[in-house]
From Swiss-Prot:
PANTHER family xrefs: AMINOGLYCOSIDE PHOSPHOTRANSFERASE DOMAIN-CONTAINING PROTEIN, AMINOGLYCOSIDE PHOSPHOTRANSFERASE DOMAIN-CONTAINING PROTEIN-RELATED
Annotated pathway: Amino-acid biosynthesis; L-threonine biosynthesis; L-threonine from L-aspartate: step 4/5
UniProt keyword list: Amino-acid biosynthesis, ATP-binding, Kinase, Nucleotide-binding, Threonine biosynthesis, Transferase
BP GO terms, sorted: threonine biosynthetic process
NCBIfam families assigned: PRK05231.1, thrB_alt
Keyword Amino-acid biosynthesis assigned: yes
EC number: 2.7.1.39
Taxonomic source organism: Burkholderia lata (strain ATCC 17760 / DSM 23089 / LMG 22485 / NCIMB 9086 / R18194 / 383)
This protein's name: Homoserine kinase
Any single Pfam family the record assigns to this protein: APH
C-alpha cells in the first residue's frame, strides 16, 4: 500500500463525479505496503479507501472486487466496493484501474495475544466456507509458477548459502505441488496475505465478555483460489511467531488452529502436510521480499520489508514444526 501514482486535487474531483459519496473532506496517501497506491478518503457520507492498482489489470480486477462483495454479503467483515454511477466497481484513473471501498473500523494489533488469534482463526475459517459458492476462479498469482519465474532473477544478489536454500526449497515445493496428496487438499478463494497489519480490531461491547472484537480483514489484492491450508499457514507464520527469531509461539498457534477447526476441521491430508505448507507460506514471502528488495520499483512513498525475516522462518519450519492440534469432538 505504497503510493506509486500521485493524485492531485483536480484528479480527485474529476474521479469523484462518478460516485454519490458527497463532498470530499480529507484525502491522504497511505505509506505502508509495497503493491498498490492507496489513499484514505473522507467525505460527508463516510470514510473510504481509494486504491489505484499498479499491477493488476482491468481483466483481473473483477475477481478481487467481486470476491469482497461476495464475502461481505455472506457476513464476513471485509471492505465492500462502492459502485460507480454506471454500476461498475472500478474505473480508470491515470490509465490504471482504481476503486473505492468502505473503510473498516478498528486498528491493527501488531502484538497479538491468544484472544486475537482465536478471533482470526474462526473468521478465516468462516471466510473459506463463505467462498465455496463464489463463481469466479483465479489462481493465487504468487504461487509456484511465480516462484519458478522469479527465483533466477534473485540469485545473483544473494549468498551461496541462501541460493542453496532458495533453489533446494523450490525443488521440494515443486514435488509437493505435484503430489496426489496436494491435489486432494481442500481449496477455494483465499486471502493469501492475512498478516497482522491486514486485520483490524475494535473494542468489544462491555456485555460480550470479550476484550477484543474483530473489525475485519482487508487488502484482498493478493487473494486467489488456492489450498485453504496455505492460507492458514501464511496466517500462522505471521500471527504466531516471535518476530526476532521466527520461532512459532505454540500458545498462539494452538489457539488460532483450534479456533479455525471449530468452524472447519482439518482433513487427514492437511494434517500430513502441515509442515510442507508452513514452508510454502514462508517461501512465498521470502521470494517476494527478496525480489522487492533487490529489484524495487520507484514509488513516492515506500517502506521495503526485510527479506531476512522469512528466511529465518523458513529455516525454522524446515527444522521443526509441531503437528496440527486435535480438538475435542464437542467442539466440532
Amino acid at each position: 500500500m505504497a503510493v506509486f501514482t500521485a493524485v492531485s486535487d483536480s484528479d480527485l474531483a474529476q474521479w469523484m463525479r462518478h460516485y454519490e459519496l458527497g463532498d470530499v473532506l480529507a484525502f491522504r496517501g497511505i505509506p505502508s505496503g509495497i503493491e498498490n497506491s492507496n489513499f484514505f478518503l473522507t467525505t460527508t457520507r463516510g470514510e473510504y479507501v481509494l486504491t489505484i492498482f499498479e499491477k493488476l489489470t482491468a481483466e483481473q480486477l473483477p475477481f478481487y472486487l467481486d470476491l469482497m462483495s461476495h464475502l461481505a454479503g455472506h457476513g464476513v467483515p471485509v471492505p465492500d466496493p462502492i459502485p460507480r454511477d454506471d454500476g461498475a466497481l472500478f474505473g480508470m484513473l491515470h490509465g490504471k484501474p482504481a476503486a473505492i471501498v468502505t473503510k473498516l473500523d478498528g486498528s491493527a494489533e501488531l502484538a497479538p495475544g491468544v484472544e486475537h488469534c482465536i478471533e482470526v482463526g474462526q473468521m478465516l475459517a468462516r471466510l473459506h466456507l463463505a467462498g465455496r459458492d463464489y463463481p469466479r476462479n483465479q489462481p493465487n498469482l504468487r504461487s509456484l509458477p511465480w516462484w519458478q519465474e522469479n527465483v533466477p532473477a534473485i540469485v545473483p544478489f544473494i549468498t551461496d548459502e541462501q541460493r542453496a536454500l532458495l533453489e533446494g526449497e523450490l525443488v521440494h515445493q515443486a514435488g509437493f505441488f505435484a503430489s496426489d496428496d496436494y491435489a486432494a487438499l481442500p481449496a477455494g478463494p483465499c486471502h493469501c496475505d492475512l498478516f497482522r497489519d491486514n486485520v483490524l480490531f475494535a473494542h468489544a461491547a462491555p456485555d460480550t465478555g470479550h476484550d477484543v472484537r474483530l473489525g475485519g480483514f482487508f487488502d484482498f489484492y493478493f487473494a486467489g483460489c488456492d489450498k485453504w491450508l496455505f492460507d492458514v499457514a501464511v496466517t500462522v507464520n505471521d500471527w504466531c511467531v516471535d518476530l526476532a527469531t521466527g520461532v512459532l509461539d505454540v500458545a498462539r498457534a494452538d489457539a488460532l488452529l483450534r479456533a479455525y477447526q471449530t468452524v472447519r476441521p482439518f482433513t487427514a491430508e492437511e494434517r500430513r502436510h502441515w509442515s510442507d505448507m508452513l514452508r510454502a507460506g514462508a517461501y512465498r514471502f521470502w521470494v517476494s521480499r527478496l525480489y522487492d528488495f533487490y529489484l524495487p520499483r520507484a514509488a513516492e512513498m515506500l517502506k521495503p520489508h526485510d527479506p531476512g525475516h522469512f528466511e529465518r522462518i523458513l529455516r525454522e519450519r524446515i527444522a521443526h514444526t509441531p503437528a496440527l492440534p486435535e480438538i475435542q469432538t464437542a467442539c466440532n
